Design a protein with these regions (language model features):
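N-terminal hydrophobic/helix-forming segments and targeting peptides
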Residues: 1-243
Length: 245
């Protein structure tokens, strides 16, 4: 939590984003030396099939692995295409000559070790950024850039502004405990959704009116809409019924 300054501490606003991301954790070392994983946050195994990953041990050593379906060769597995991808049917294969559980333990790998997946970050010639796990690193960068702008331009805002970067969003803890006295609004900056039934596209600001838990604050939503309209910012208001932000 960082205070950026401002003239009115009794009508302050918090701008929040989260820096935590999706991943996995070792939950079982199999007798054959393969690793069973459990998800951290909403990491979907369908999106991680055949992905390179790294196992981070408690001793600080890092080991490469691949997350794939059990019996992963289409040449020997007749049920390959029909098998549902879940954490029960998939496993991490270490890039180490391990044959059993004891071999894995000798490397220092144990249950509870975090597993990080390759983000596959690409910056195209046309300026597009493609990557896994941009949620919510982009928004964190935006808020840091805004703080830098205010400092360099020596801008004193009418309302006191706090920037809150949380590290618990993906596991549901939220950031309510860090709200200072005098704050009357909190605006969460997160990734917008694009898809069937939504108005937003990739060039717009996405304003969420309601998520799976209920409607958002009327005054805050109305204020965001008004600000976008007055500044000619392309935006869409959507209901995100499958997520809780």
């Amino acid at each position: 939590l960082v205070k950026l300054g401002g003239k009115d501490d009794k009508n302050a606003v918090v701008l929040a984003a989260h820096m935590d991301t999706l991943g996995g954790m070792v939950c079982q070392i199999m007798d054959n030396g393969h690793l069973k994983l459990t998800n951290i946050g909403g990491m979907n195994p369908n999106n991680a099939e055949a992905e390179n990953c790294k196992v981070y041990t408690k001793s600080g050593k890092v080991y490469d692995a691949t997350f794939q379906l059990e019996n992963a060769s289409v040449h020997v597995n007749g049920e390959y295409s029909d098998t549902k991808r879940t954490y029960e049917t998939m496993e991490a294969i270490l890039d180490e000559p391990v044959k059993n559980k004891e071999d894995v333990k000798k490397l220092g790998i144990m249950t509870g070790d975090f597993v990080c997946f390759d983000p596959r970050t690409v910056v195209t010639e046309s300026g597009y950024i493609k990557s896994r796990f941009l949620d919510d690193k982009f928004s964190t960068a935006i808020l840091l850039g805004y703080a830098k702008y205010l400092k360099e331009k020596e801008i004193q805002t009418e309302r006191t502004i706090y920037v809150l970067i949380t590290s618990y969003e993906e596991v549901g803890h939220g950031g309510c405990a860090a709200i200072p006295d005098g704050v009357t609004e909190m605006i969460s900056v997160d990734m917008g959704c694009v898809g069937k039934g939504l108005e937003c596209d990739e060039t717009m600001v996405s304003i969420c009116a309601k998520d799976s838990m209920g409607p958002y604050d009327y005054q805050v939503v109305s204020g965001l809409i008004k600000a976008a309209q007055e500044n000619d910012i392309a935006f869409a208001v959507d209901v995100l019924s499958l997520i809780h932000i």
